Amino acid sequence: MKKEIYNVEGIEIEVEHIDKNDADRERRLIAYQFKTIREQAGMNRKDFSDWLGIPYRTMQEWELGRRQAPDYVLRLIAYKVKMEKERGNL
């Protein structure tokens, strides 16, 4: 299957192709990107939510695609993960 590569604040995310006509495409794409960023940080959901100061339930719903994280929040979190990795804090 065709894969698409997205770059979110310097973190490359490879995603299986999601049909452009899929009504839930954007929500599913952001959910997958959010999960990938968390995995890049090397944390489980609980640790990641504590580290970011985001309620666990909110983060879980973003990651499962039940709610859509705002795009700017995804970019800010990706930036924080990238910077903390560069500083050696992750």
Describe each region flagged by the PLM.
Residues 1-28, 78, 83-90:
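N-terminal flexible/basic segments that precede or flank functional cores
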